[in-house]
Each structure stands twice: as structure tokens, then as C-alpha cells.
Amino acid sequence: MDGPGASAVVVRVGIPDLQQTKCLRLDPTAPVWAAKQRVLCALNHSLQDALNYGLFQPPSRGRAGKFLDEERLLQDYPPNLDTPLPYLEFRYKRRVYAQNLIDDKQFAKLHTKANLKKFMDYVQLHSTDKVARLLDKGLDPNFHDPDSGECPLSLAAQLDNATDLLKVLRNGGAHLDFRTRDGLTAVHCATRQRNAGALTTLLDLGASPDYKDSRGLTPLYHSALGGGDALCCELLLHDHAQLGTTDENGWQEIHQACRFGHVQHLEHLLFYGANMGAQNASGNTALHICALYNQESCARVLLFRGANKDVRNYNSQTAFQVAIIAGNFELAEVIKTHKDSDVVPFRETPSYAKRRRLAGPSGLASPRPLQRSASDINLKGDQPAASPGPTLRSLPHQLLLQRLQEEKDRDRDGEQENDISGPSAGRGGHSKISPSGPGGSGPAPGPGPASPAPPAPPPRGPKRKLYSAVPGRKFIAVKAHSPQGEGEIPLHRGEAVKVLSIGEGGFWEGTVKGRTGWFPADCVEEVQMRQYDTRHETREDRTKRLFRHYTVGSYDSLTSHSDYVIDDKVAILQKRDHEGFGFVLRGAKAETPIEEFTPTPAFPALQYLESVDVEGVAWKAGLRTGDFLIEVNGVNVVKVGHKQVVGLIRQGGNRLVMKVVSVTRKPEEDSARRRAPPPPKRAPSTTLTLRSKSMTAELEELASIRRRKGEKLDEILAVAAEPTLRPDIADADSRAATVKQRPTSRRITPAEISSLFERQGLPGPEKLPGSLRKGIPRTKSVGEDEKLASLLEGRFPRSTSMQDTVREGRGIPPPPQTAPPPPPAPYYFDSGPPPTFSPPPPPPGRAYDTVRSSFKPGLEARLGAGAAGLYDSGTPLGPLPYPERQKRARSMIILQDSAPEVGDVPRPAPAATPPERPKRRPRPSGPDSPYANLGAFSASLFAPSKPQRRKSPLVKQLQVEDAQERAALAVGSPGPVGGSFAREPSPTHRGPRPGGLDYSSGEGLGLTFGGPSPGPVKERRLEERRRSTVFLSVGAIEGSPPSADLPSLQPSRSIDERLLGTGATTGRDLLLPSPVSALKPLVGGPSLGPSGSTFIHPLTGKPLDPSSPLALALAARERALASQTPSRSPTPVHSPDADRPGPLFVDVQTRDSERGPLASPAFSPRSPAWIPVPARREAEKPTREERKSPEDKKSMILSVLDTSLQRPAGLIVVHATSNGQEPNRLGAEEERPGTPELAPTPMQAAAVAEPMPSPRAQPPGSIPADPGPGQGSSEEEPELVFAVNLPPAQLSSSDEETREELARIGLVPPPEEFANGILLATPPPGPGPLPTTVPSPASGKPSSELPPAPESAADSGVEEADTRSSSDPHLETTSTISTVSSMSTLSSESGELTDTHTSFADGHTFLLEKPPVPPKPKLKSPLGKGPVTFRDPLLKQSSDSELMAQQHHATSTGLTSAAGPARPRYLFQRRSKLWGDPVESRGLPGPEDDKPTVISELSSRLQQLNKDTRSLGEEPVGGLGSLLDPAKKSPIAAARCAVVPSAGWLFSSLGELSTISAQRSPGGPGGGASYSVRPSGRYPVARRAPSPVKPASLERVEGLGAGVGGAGRPFGLTPPTILKSSSLSIPHEPKEVRFVVRSVSARSRSPSPSPLPSPSPGSGPSAGPRRPFQQKPLQLWSKFDVGDWLESIHLGEHRDRFEDHEIEGAHLPALTKEDFVELGVTRVGHRMNIERALRQLDGS
């Protein structure tokens, strides 16, 4: 408290409430708020309502005690010289009484609840006299209304004409900075209510314009956020409000104003010096936000005022590219055509209130004026002086209160008098504002409090012009205005007004019919004639022109048609009943043909194949990724929307005749432009974040990319073209790549490289403010959050994320080489644009964006370093067979996609790699490693690693802006593709990669790289990405598992196969080098090195002390794994650790060499771990997806086919769509292949879940090849599906709502990420467990699982498809579709969840239980300490992935990891962890160790659910440990159970989706997902270990403890665990449930019966699920009996949720509608059916 000069002063702070005293060093030059935060941080006890504690200066030397105003500087308050050290008290802000007016009794009598309520009523009724009377009696007005949480002052601030009331309250002891229960001060409340009069009064009373709310946001931020009358914004700025406040996502006021199109606020902000170049956590400037949200007016203002349109976000995207990605072509045109010569900076100087005393010392004072945006040409010297530190008060209100008050009143009176004449008579603002510089435009710098200049510029009197208006905007008078002051002009409704300048007090100067003068701004409204009319009128022409620009090559790099090689072919596809056609359709969504669409050489049709499953039906028919559909069954579909095309495909049944056109760019240019050689087909994935956007958007983005980097588009196209050139590899890979995040080698610009480094933690990532990130979950920047939530957001996030992805994980792939942007950008925009912008999935990287973003570029840098890196990979690829290479490329892409998500990538890697692995097993490393080394993969992996680093800062942003994308990425990453591949390469150069670092990175890369199914995976991933923000994630998830499967089965596997093979393959592939050795490395990988002795903490990524419980647990797991070589449980453990840290490291590391070292442990050893990460992501993703959009979800699940177009705007899972029960069909087919277990399921899932049915189709082929692995694969796939499914759907529901719900439960935010993670977790089992499963088959369990698999497969025709779907393909499709929006939404939510989840990953999975928001910060912290990735959704995923990985590890070790690990990754990964994951996630410390955490979380959650929750949690712990050892499969089962149940219940909560999920989980994911519906069937399918594990799981569950609640069920235990999670998740889930369920229901319904029966057989293996409930009275039914009964009434999809929630027979009659919704039965029909069946039971 010394002079301002003193740096820090030691202050003794007494905390009477805690009876403590602390000596703290406080900065006297900082605001009291900062000191208060220091004190709060120093406390070891939490204080209730801590925000309303303040520093109190005790009375001394005759001076009354006073609370220090929070926005004043500490040094403004002279210290008490009576004490050796300055002494302050930290106490609750109560009224400060001058003397003891009343004794305690009297005080208590006065402050009764009745009195306080009466007082609030008086305030509400404006009874100023009564309020004054009570205050005179001594009532303390600083209290919260128990009902509303308001305090008297905040309530009064929201009332009109409350000036006197506010004064009375203030004089009666009300603290101006007293916060409501919501953390808002009266200034915030007045601003949010746009109550200029109250705001003026408060400011006059000495309130600071810069009070922070609970999120650290100022009233100005809220003003920009809320919009409306800009007068409050003007008042705040006039009163020296601080500019540049950032939320958790790095969004500043300017970003929010642009997000919501608040043009006037934006202009005021710019005028007062807002930084137009400010970048949020994703690197997006306000112009990027405008481009994303299509806020043309704001964009025009920004450009007019000199905003730099060339600034790139962390995805290396310019605003123009973002606009293209978002499908906002008109805006893109505006940005593109803007010239610097059009810039007109502000020539005026802002005026400031002179009353407010400027604090010279305040650091803000001077800078603030200097903060003026580039637009202001003349920064007046006085300006700085004029603007006081935000925290400064005009006068110390304590000392100068009276003077201030008098002055205020004086000012107020004078101003108000003038004001009152004005239209907004009550707008004290005029006076206040006016006062400031009546004449001078300069800010009245005078610190003098007096300066009642207000009268000079009475608003009514001569109006003072603030600044000239931006030309080109059209306004119409919406209400009449009659002049009331000099200079005003009359307005009549409907008159066109030309606005000339903006004046003070809400007055504008304009010209109307020749009259020029002033009028109130609220009398006119801007009309977007051009925007709407033009859009409708000339959309066709505009589209043509834009497409010409963007797609045909009017851009720098784009040239004419001659650039393209057009190859048309007719393909006749004949598929079997339960399989899909093996391709994912994507394209513009439109109810009616889009006549405006004009085919171009680049985009000959609206619908194109986003991915083709390698070796699938479509693949064998010669179809390749990126082929455009010209005719379907003889019907021309060039201009037809997605749904209709899907319908046409479905109508054909099992036969499909398609005429397609392959558009490839001429190779020469491509190679010349692109660094990546043919192998880099995945390069497209590295390409821009075009994936999500509609093809048109994508193409355009490509063009824009090209534009920005001539080589980029070429790269993208080249990649796309290259695939066409080499249809096999190139096609699948590059096409997929195109759709996916941009390929690693796509375009590594210097910016990207730097960005990459930034991401890696090099200087670049400065932009990821950890703190910002941290807060993100709860307070995601509203704009970004909403943006994410909105379709656009989905789109943009894709775009944003895409950018992020691009930079961070190679995240956004260009659209398919030939992917045509859907001409109807608006449609995309409206209906599916978000999905269109799969690019956002990369956003997962966004949280890490800063870091990751950088990272991505780094990848690119690597790529750039070159294309060489990519090429290196590519080179190895080159040697590989085309299919494999393709896969690799794809895998790479997927990895890239997944790279952003550490966890994600890791787990998919195993999945992805397995398919390839079988082929390259001998040399999986080599081939994989090349890819892994590939820049793209590396980037991908690195991205995850990056995310770790970025964790804290980026997490938040990610969440908001990129969370979705990141989550999507994460989800996608986890995809089998990512995980699988990462793993495969991992063995190769994973050896060196000792730390968790590698695994994340390696895993991501490895996954993608590692699988022979890179192509399919990539495709799938692309599809996913395309589908939505989550697309990437989903794709990765879906792709990954198939990838993993594929390797298992054969080099060129469909995604499905990969998925199927993932488990087996993963285990196999991961283990490929040597199952045991691989596992060992995995274990070792989990530790730090290949050796099993060192383990890496899943959360922190730090090497574990060998003696630590976690390390011991890991070692035990490793041993178990070693004994069960095939499983990859160790991998899971390592994966999480390695993943988190690894990704960072990997990110930093060079793709090749780094990746090798990093990846080797992760890849091989962490294969399981990786799988968990991906699985988790997947789980997360599904949750997210579910959350993402109920509508999408529903589409995703049941109507994936039609739904897929829904969100993805054309993405469709042909497989799934072709057959409503595609999943069923798939399942059947899969089971048919002989790998009924996982393999069929994954296939199915893939078909259903992802628009990559083709891969699925391939899986069938694959499946036979890899029966055992298939099993694992199947498991994995379902997990994948889950991941995809859940998250998006939930996201779909309102982001905010969901978040709140989830927050309430403590799961929503986590579920999004977590769900993503969990879902991913589910898929991970496939990859992770797959190996386990594969081994399991080798062991007894898999085989057990195997038999069920067929059943499951058949059974899960729907479910399995669903599982499959959940696996990713179907879900992914839908998911991705919904993911775009939901992802975005999720992004925000995810942020919280992510953090929370991260925490869990830490091992504190239960943290999630806490309100997501609170945990979030905590989570961040843990995450923070862990790899950065935790922070982001990715982080979250990572954490999930860790959990998953750990769980995976555990399950792999003890239980066929295939099912368990992945499952745990599920939303309930944490919960899952409870079981398998606990070991896995905390597995390092020890299964038990992990379990307690998991258990605690589980128990809290389960307790909430009140169902064996605790036992579930605990049992899993115990059981896990034992299961891990006894039945490796069992542990997996346990983990899987945990995961699967989570997936299952998640799905259950989703309702129909749940069915799919559930089905998928048990069958596809190992029985977890479908366990609830047909656990046995599903389990038998043992897509994941569960089926065999089911028994094992059951025993394990039971062994673990029926308490797990899943005892009966393999996931029974986990389900309860999940249940808690589910409960948490449910809030977000229900929304998605509603939609998804509907969709699922449709599909689920018919399939359900089949799957249900299937479970029956499966039940045998599962024992628990198929209980003879008919022989028992309802009251004696166990939860499994309830599940069997549900299946008997064809509502098996809800089984998982019911079991997760431990719903037993006795509970059924008492279930309410709300209970059913929580249980996922969101469809009225389903609920009625259940209730009807219950009545029948009662009757019988």
C-alpha cells in the first residue's frame, strides 16, 4: 500500500470469518479486485459467496472503516499507519455502519426473512420512501433475495426511473460492487437490461464501469453480448470502460458484438479504441467471427474502419476463407473485394466523462486510449489521459462520495434536464455522455471530478457527433420520430434513412428525403436487402459466380477446367442385407433440388462420396472418395439434396446403380504445388478446414486456401486429384483427406509452421491463454459458444476449428478433391452448413488451437519441412500396397483429424492400424511410422500433444469456438482411424517415444498412419468431419476403429472392417510388432519408455514413480497384458499419458523423428491406450453428437442416412441409410463374415454410424478375415459409434441449455467432451480392446464374445448398426452432421466437460460429478498440469482418452481391452474408468487407485442416480483389478463395461440413440453399447471384449461387484457408473436423445427386435442381460431383467440407460416422465409403450 511506485507491498490480511490472518504481497498499482483474487487464492477454506467478500479498511484515526472499491487501485487507499504492516480485513460486504446504530438483537430482528422479502418488494415497487425508512432503521441492503438471487441494488438497476431508488440504496449502505447470486453487479444488471438511466445513475454514484462478474467479464462485454440499444455501451465507454476484456475463450467485446451482429456496439467499441485485430483463443479476429456468423454489417464496419482482412486464425484461415467455409459467400465476396483504399478510419476522437478521475498509475489508463483500433487515425494525446484505468474510480468513492454525489447530482441534474427533453428522456446516458465533451471531440481528459460539462451537450440540444457512419448500410425508419430538440428531423415509418454519423446519447445524424438532422438510433433499423433479396433473387447467379471464383479456379492458383480430369463411371453395387454399400455420401442438404446449383468441373454434382470403405461394396465397384453422384438408379441427382439422394439409394434396397464422376486435378500441378506426393492424399485432410462445410464451401475454401497459399488449394486438389489419379490409394486417401482436415502436407505455410510451433508450446502458442481457456467451459465465450452451438457455428467451428484443426491437427481437410461445395451455401448455412463445416472438428484443436493450431502448422511445417515429412511417410506408404498406402494416407488424415485430440488419436490409432497392421504387422512400424512420421500424421498426433500443452489456455476457447471442433477432432481423432493408425506406426517408431507424449501424438499420428485402413479411416474421418464439427472426430472415431479393424483383417479394409478389426487388429496390430512386446511397450509406453518399468501418468503425462500406485497398477496391467499379449490394455494406459504429454511433445517434435520416438511407445504399446483416447473421444463425440443436436442425433442414429444430410448437409451413411436397419444388416453381415463379434458390428456401426458405410462394407469382408480381431474391432467400432453419437446429439440441444443441464449434473460439459471421450472410449475398446479382443478370442473370452457377435451382429441389425453407428460411421455421419453444430455447441459445453473430464482423466473422473463449471476450472488445473490437451475439449478427450487409455489398458490387461478400454473412454469414461478405466486412467497408479477416483465419481454420480452407484464404482475398481488379471478380457470387459455402459446409458439417455448405442456398445463396442438393449447379443458380438467379456464382464462386473450395477451386465457395472455420468450426460443427452432417439427409434425400432433377440443369445454369454424376467414378479426383477423386458417390448435401445441407472423392477412403476427422459426414453411413443407394457405386467 505504499506509493504507486512500490512494486509489491506486504499487507497483512485478516479473514475474520475464517479466523485467519495472512501476509500477502499485493501490487498497489493493481486494482483492488486483483488483490482480492490473491486473497481468495491464498485461502485454504472456501468462502460462501466469495465474490461478495471484499478488502475492508478498518476504521482508524477517526476515519470510518470502508470497503475498498474493487476497481480502484490498491494504492488509492492510504494504509493505516498505526500498524507496522498495512492491515486490511477480508470480509463479507456488509453495510458499514458509522457507529453501532443497533445492537445485535435489534439487527437480527430487522433482518428477518420477512423483512428482507418486504424490502425487495419495496424496491420492486419503487417504494423509495419505504426503502429509505428501512434503511434508516439500519437494514443492510447487501443481501440476496432467496428466490431470485438478486440484491436490492441490482433489482433497482433493472427498473426504469430508479435513479432516486438507487441513490437511496447507495446512501443506505448498498455496495456498488455487491454481486447477485449470479455474480453480476448492479452495473452489469443495468447494462444487460439496457437501462441507460440506471446505468448513468450508478456510474454517477461512483460505480466503476469495469466491475467484473463471476466470469471476470465487464458490463461492456455484456453490453456487446446483449446488443439492443447501444446507449449503455456508449455510456460505459464514455465513462472510461476498459476495452479488451476477454472471456475464457479469448473473446473480447468486439468478438461478441460481431458474433451477434451488434453493429452499433461494434462501432462504439471501435471508436473508443477496441483492437480490431484482437484474436480469440482460436486466433479468430472479429472479422473472422463476422465471416463465420455471416454478420455482413459488422464485417463492413470492420473493413471500413481498417480491419486487416489478411489476419489468419490459428487454423491459418483468413476471414475470407472462414466465410467460404461457413458458406457465407456474399460476405466472402465483400471481404474479398474490399480494398485498403476503402478504409476510412475514425477522424474524430472519442469523448470521455471528465468526472472520472484518471489514475495515472493504472496501467490501463494510458494504454487504454492507445488501444484504439487501427481505425482511429488520430490518437489524441489527451485521449490516454482521458481514459482512466478501467479500475479507477472517478473519486475514491469513500472519501469523495459526498463530493461525487453532489457533483453527480449536479451533473445528473444538468445533464438530465437536457437529456429529458431528448427522446430517451430517461437515458441519463446522454447527459453523461454529453457532458463529456460537449464541444471538443477529444475525450475530456480532465481527471477533475467536477466538469459538469454535460449541460453543454444536452442530448436534446445541439447533438455532438461521435464519428461518421459507415457508408453502404441501408436503414429504414421503423418508428416515427418528431423533432424535440434543435437539429432533429422528423421520421416517418418506412422512410429510407441514410445515416451520416453517429452522435452521443443514441442519436444519429442522417438524411431522409433531403432532410438532414438528428434522430434517435432506435427509430431506424438496418435492412439487409442485399443479403436477403439478393440471396433469393440472384443466388443462382451469385452461386455461379462464387463457384466460378472458388471452385473453378478464378483464384490465383485455381485455373480452368483443363486443371481437372473428369472420369465418369457407372457402378452397380449389390450388397447383402445387413451391410451397407460401404460409402459415406455427403453433399448439400435441401428439401428440393437446388436449381441454382451450376455444375462445374470441380463440382459436377451436389452429392459426393465423402468416403468409401476400402474393400467395401462401393470400393469393389470402383467408387472412390470424392466421386460425385450424377445418377442414382437412373435418376439424375446432380442438383438433388442429400436426403432425396439418400432416399433414392435406400429405395433400391440391396442393389444400387450409380453413375459417378471422378474429378481429379491434373497431377502435375498438384505435385508441383503440393508438397505431398501421391501418398499425401491425406494431405487434403491437412488442407483447410473445409471438411465440414458443404462441398461448395469446401471447394471454395480450397479456393480461398489456394488464394491465400497458391499451393494450398492445389495441394488440396492435388491430394484429391491424386487419389483419383491413383484411385485405389489416392482416391480413398486423398478423397477422404479432402473431406478431412487438411492433410498434413496439404499446405504448410510459414504461418502454419509458426503456428505449429506455437501449438507445440513454442512461442507461437502465446495466444492460447491458459487462463482464458480454463474458464472457457463455463463461460465459453457466448458468441463462440453459441456460434458453435448454432449451425453456423457448427459450420464455422468447423471453419474456425477447421482452421484450428488445420493449424493444430492438420485438422481440416480440404473438401474431397472433387468435393463440390454445395451451391446453396445458404442452405448449408441454414440446414446443414455447420455440418458442412466439418472443418470445425479440427477445432478440438482449437482449444489447443493456439498451441495446437500452431502445431498444425507445425505439422504442416513438418510437412513443409516438408512435404518431405509427409512424403517420408508417403514414401513408406508408397512402398505399401495402394490400398494400404491409401489407408495410410487416410489414416494419416484421420490422424490429423484426430491429432487435435490427443486422446482421440491415440485410441483410433490402434483401431486404424490394426487393419493395416495385419498387412504390415511385420513392418507396421515402418509403414505406419512413415505415415506417423508424415507431417500430417505427425501434426495430427502433435496436435493432440499440442492440446495438452494448450490445455489450459485453449481449452476454453476451444470449447467455445473450437471445443466442438476440437471435440469433433478429438472424437474423430479417437476414431479407429486415428487411434488405429497412430498405434500401428507407433510400434515402428514408438519405441523411442518413451513418454506419454509420443503416444498422444504418435497415437494420433500413429493411428492414422498406423493402419492399413488409413484411407478408409481417413475417409471415415473425413466423413465424420464433414458431417459436422465433430465430423473429424467422428470420422476419426469411426474411421479409426475400422482402420484398426482393417489392419486386422486386411490392408484395405473398410472403415467398418477397420472398426471390426480395430479391436483385434489394434491388439494385433499394436501388438503386431509382437503382441506381448507391443503390449509391453504399450505398458512401457504408458510409462515413459518401451520398458514396462516406467509409466506415464495418464493425466499429467509425466513419468510415474515406479512405486506409485498408478505405476504399479500399470505394471500389473502391463503384466496382464503381457500375458494377454493380444490385448492392448497397456497401450490404453500409456496412451492417455503419452497422449496428453505425447501430443504436446509430438506436436513439438518433428513429425517423423519425433513421431517415431513419441509414437513408438504410443503406437505399439499404447495402441490400446491410444485406442482409449480415441475411444474416449469417440465416446465424447457421440455424447457430443447426441448433445449436439437431438435432431441431428436422431438422424444420426436412426436416420443416419437421411440425417446424415441433416447436419453434415449431405453427409450420409449410405450403408446405414440404404437400410433403415443398416446397423442390423451390418451386424448380420459382420457376424456373417465369421467375425460376428466385433467385426460385423463395427462394420455395421460404421455403415450406420458413419457415412462411411463402405468401410463398413469392407469390414464384412474384413470380418471373416479377422474373426477374432473382428470381435475386438466390433467392440471398438461400437465405441466409436458411441462417441460419435452421443456428444453431437447433446450438443444439438441448446449448447447453453445442455451445458447448464450437464453442469447441473456435473456431466454435461464433461459429457460433451467426456461423452466424446467416453464415446471415444467406447470405440477405443474396439481398437484397444480389439487387440484384447483379438487376444481374447485367442483367450476364451473373445471367442465367447465371438459367438455372441454374430448374434449381436444379427441382433444388432439396428443396434449393431447403431452400435456401428455409435461406433462412428452411422453416428458419425449423423453425428458429424449434428456434430458441426453440436460440436460447436459441445465445444463450449465440451470445454467445461472437457476440463472436467480432464480432471477425471486425471483420475478424478468424479470431478465431473461436480457441476461441470466448477469442476471445469479444476479440471483445467489438473489438465493444465497434465498435457495441455486436457484443457481443450480435446484435452478433455485426452483426459478421456487417458481414462480410456488407462481403462483400456486395464481392460486390455485384465479384460479384453478391446471392449473395456474403449468403452471407458466413453462419456462415462471416467465412470468407465471406474472400472477398467480406473485402472487404465489411473491404471498407472493402480486399478484400485483409479477405481476409487472413478468410484468416487461413479459413486457420486451413481448415488445421484441412486443405483448401486457406489458398488458399481467400487466394484469395478476391485473387479477391475481382479478382472484385469484373471480375465484380461474381463478387465476389458470391465473397462468396456464401464465404457460401454456409459455409451449404453448415454445412448439410452438418447433414447433411440441409446438403443443404437447400447446395441452397438455391447455388440459393436464389445457389448457395451448394446448391452442395455441386447447386452448379451451385443456382448456376444463382443464387438468389444464385452460379449465374451460380457460373461467375463459379468463375472467381472459381478466380480467387480454387482455393485457396479452392471454385474449382470458386462457393462452393468459400468452402466451405473455411466449412469452417474449418464445422469450427468443425460441432461445433455436428453436433448440429443430426443432427436436421436427419434431417429434411432425409427431405425432402432425395427432393428431393435432383431437385436433384442440377438441379445438373448448374447444374453447367454452375458448371463445377466437375458434373465427370465417372465418367471419373476416385477418387484423382483433385476436391472438385467428390466433390460430383457425392455428388449422384449422392442425398446432394448434403452436397456443400457436403464441398467446404467440401476433401474430394477421395483423402480419401474414409480418412474416419472422426467425419469424416463433421464433414462433416455425421450420419445413419447417409447414412454407410452413402456408404460403400457408396465400396465400389462401389473394386470398380469
Curated annotation (Swiss-Prot):
Major localization class: cytoplasm
Top-rank taxon: Eukaryota
ANK repeat feature ranges: 148-181, 182-214, 215-245, 249-278, 282-311, 315-345
Segments for region (Intramolecular interaction with the ANK repeats): 1-75
Mutagenesis or variant effect for residue 680 to A: Abolishes interaction with ABI1
Residues annotated with Phosphothreonine modification: 913, 1131, 1235
Region of interest (Required for interaction with ABI1), residue spans: 677-684
Keywords tagged on the record: Actin-binding, ANK repeat, Cell projection, Coiled coil, Cytoplasm, Methylation, Phosphoprotein, Repeat, SH3 domain, SH3-binding, Synapse
Stretches with biased composition (Pro residues): 444-460, 812-845, 1252-1262, 1322-1334, 1648-1658
Domain PDZ: 570-664
Family (UniProt): Belongs to the SHANK family.
Record note on quaternary structure: May homomultimerize via its SAM domain. Interacts with BAIAP2, DBNL and SLC17A7/VGLUT1. Interacts with DLGAP1/GKAP, GRM1/MGLUR1, GRM5/MGLUR5 and LZTS3 C-termini via its PDZ domain. Interacts with ABI1, HOMER1, HOMER2, HOMER3 and CTTN/cortactin SH3 domain. Is part of a complex with DLG4/PSD-95 and DLGAP1/GKAP. Interacts (via PDZ domain) with the GRIA1 subunit of the AMPA receptor (via PDZ-binding motif). Interacts with WASF1 and CYFIP2; the interactions mediate the association of SHANK3 with the WAVE1 complex.
Stated role: Major scaffold postsynaptic density protein which interacts with multiple proteins and complexes to orchestrate the dendritic spine and synapse formation, maturation and maintenance. Interconnects receptors of the postsynaptic membrane including NMDA-type and metabotropic glutamate receptors via complexes with GKAP/PSD-95 and HOMER, respectively, and the actin-based cytoskeleton. Plays a role in the structural and functional organization of the dendritic spine and synaptic junction through the interaction with Arp2/3 and WAVE1 complex as well as the promotion of the F-actin clusters.
Protein name according to UniProt: SH3 and multiple ankyrin repeat domains protein 3
Native source species: Rattus norvegicus (Rat)
